[in-house]
Amino acid sequence: MALSFSRDRSRALPLAAEIGALGVVFGDIGTSPLYALKQGVLAVGGTDFTSADVMGLLSLITWSIILSVTVKYVMLVLRADNDGEGGILALVTLLDLHRSAIGLRWYLLAAGLVGAAMLIGDGVLTPAMSVLSAIEGLQVISPALLDWIVPLTVLVLAAVFLSQRLGTERIASFYGPIMVLWFGSLAVLGVYGIMQAPEVLAGLDPRAGFHTVTTHPGLAGVIIGACFLAITGGEALYADLGHFGRKTIARAWLFVAMPALLLNYFGQGAILLRDPQAVRNPFYDLCPDLFDIPLLFLATAATVIASQSIITGVFSLAKQAIELGYLPPMRIRYTSEHNEQHIYVGRLNWLLMVACIAVVLGFEASDRLASAYGIAVAFAMVTTSILFVAQVNRAWKWPKPAVIALGIGLFSLDAAFASANLTKLHEGGWLPLTIAGIVIFVMVSWRRGLEGVVAQQQRFTEPLDEFVLRGDRASDAESPRTAIFLSRAGAMTPVALSRMADLLKVRFQRAVIVSVWIAARPRVSVDDRVRVTNLDGGFIRVDLRFGYMQQIDVPSVLGPALSARGVDPDEAIYVIGHERIIPPDEVVRGRDVVAHVFAFLARNAERSVDRFGLPRSRTVEIGYPVKL
C-alpha cells in the first residue's frame, strides 16, 4: 500500500517553520565560519598579513553573501519554483524543454545535467570538509589531540551515513533548535570579538575588497576562491525550497542566518587584528577558553546536521534524475509516513560514505581539503544562472533589456567565482570535477541506452490498435484471467504481450496495458493520475501519471480504476518485460563504450517489480534480448 503524504508547510506556524528551515536549509552555509575566513587569510600569506588584508577579506565575504545569496537566490531564484519545488532539475522541468528548438533544448538540458552532477560531486566533499573543520577544534583545546582528528572525523562520518537507513524523522525535530543555538552562538561570539576591535567594521566598505584584490594581483584568484567558501551553501536554499517555501526561507535568512554569519566573520576579523597567530583557527580563538569544549560539541553537531542536509539533498536529486530517466533505477525506501522528502537510497549512501571517508583519509586536514572544495558548487551556480535567465526570458516574458542586464549581472558574478576556483584545479579541484564527470557520463549513457532500447522495441512491435484487431486470429487459447502488461512504449504493443501471443499463442480474457509516465512537475493530483481507455477485444489501456517526487506504487493507484470496470485487481497477474542488453562485441566507437556502460547499469538496476511495487507472487517476467 502506498504511503500517504501530506504537505503542510503552508500551515506551519511561521516561527516553527523558520526554526525548521534553520535546521534543514542553512546547515551548509551556516558552518562555513569554521573555515572560510581562515582560508582567505592563508591565501594572502598566512601570518604575514596586514589589517588592510583582513578588512578586504571581510569585504569580499560580506558582498559575496549579499550579492550571491541574498540578491541572486533569496530575491530572484527562489521565485522560480516548479509547483513549490526548487533545485536545478526542477528548473529544467519548469522550462518545458520539449517545446524548445532542438539546439536550445540540448544546451539547456546539458546545463541542468552538468549542474546536477556538480552538486552530487559536491555532496562527497561537503560532509568531509564540514566535520573535519569542526573536529579540528581539538588542536585548539590541546595540541596533543592532533592525531585524533582524522580518526574521530571518520567515526562521525561513518555514524552519519550508517544512520541514514533508520530514517531521520525522529531526530530531525532537534535540528532546528540546535541550529538556532548554533546561529545564536555565532552572533554572540561575533559581537564579543567586534567589541574588542570595532575598527574591523570598516570591512563593510566594498572598496576594501577591491583594494585587497588589486594589492595582490597574483593571488586574486586564490583570494576570491577562498572567500567563495563562505557562500558554497547558497545553492541549498533553492534545492530545499520544497521543504518550507520562499517566504519562510527568506525570513530565516534575512533575520537570523545572514546577520549571525556576518557578525561572526567580523568577530573573527577582530581577533585576527589583535592576534595574527589566531590564523591557526580564528573561529575557535574567538571563543573564550572556558567554552571551547561546549563549542566543539556544538560545532560537531552543526556539521553533522549540515552533512545530513547534503546527503538528503543528494538522495532527492538522485530520485528526480531516476524518475526523469537520467539515472538507472535504484531501490528507494521512504523512511517517513508523513514526508515524501525523507528517503533512503542504499547504494548511493554507501558510495557517498566510502568516497567521503576516502577524501578525509587522503587530505587529512581542512586546509588541504579546501583546495578541492567549492569548485563544483561554483559551476553549479553558473548552470543555475543559465537556466534562471532562460526562465525569465521564456516563461516570465521580461523585457529584453531587463533579461540582458540580469544575465550580465549574474554571469559576471558567477564567472568571477568559477574562474577563481579554477586556480584550485591542480591542488585537488580535479577531484569533484572528476566525480561530476563520471556522473554526467553515467547520465548520458543511461539516457542514450534507454532511447536505444525504446527504438529497438518500436522496430519489432506494432501499434497497439493493430494488435487488438488481429488478437483473436493470432491466439489458439484464451486464459480466463486478467493480465496487466506494463509498457514503456506508449501506443505500441508491449513486447511481453506480443511475445506471449506470437510464441505461446495465448490471449487473456482481459488485457490491461499500463503505461507509467513521469510528469515534468513534482506532483500529480489524484484526479489527474489515471486515464483509462477502453479498446476492443477485452483490452483496456491505462495511463498512470506521477510527479517526479512521488512514490510510484502501481497496484494501489491502478486498483480502484480496475474495480470500477469489474476487474478484481487482487486476482490479476502482472506481466512485465525484462530486457537482456547485448552490447557490441567490439569497442571501436564512443557509442560502443556507452552501450557497454548501459548494459552494466541495466544489469544492476532495480527491477521493475520492485520499482513499481508489484506483488511478486502475481508477477511474471518475460526476458528478451535487445542488441544495441
Swiss-Prot record:
The keyword Signal does not apply. The keyword Ligase does not apply. Pfam families: K_trans (PF02705), K_trans_C (PF22776). It comes from the Bacteria. One of its GO terms (cellular component) is plasma membrane. The chain crosses the membrane at residues 12-32, 57-77, 106-126, 141-161, 174-194, 219-239, 253-273, 295-315, 343-363, 369-389, 402-422, 425-445. Keywords: Cell inner membrane, Cell membrane, Ion transport, Membrane, Potassium, Potassium transport, Symport, Transmembrane, Transmembrane helix, Transport. It is found in: Cell inner membrane. InterPro entries: K+_transporter (IPR003855), K_trans_C (IPR053952), K_trans_N (IPR053951), Kup (IPR023051). GO terms for molecular function: potassium ion transmembrane transporter activity; symporter activity. It is a multi-pass membrane protein. It catalyses: K(+)(in) + H(+)(in) = K(+)(out) + H(+)(out). Transport of potassium into the cell. Likely operates as a K(+):H(+) symporter. Belongs to the HAK/KUP transporter (TC 2.A.72) family. This is Probable potassium transport system protein Kup. The gene is kup.
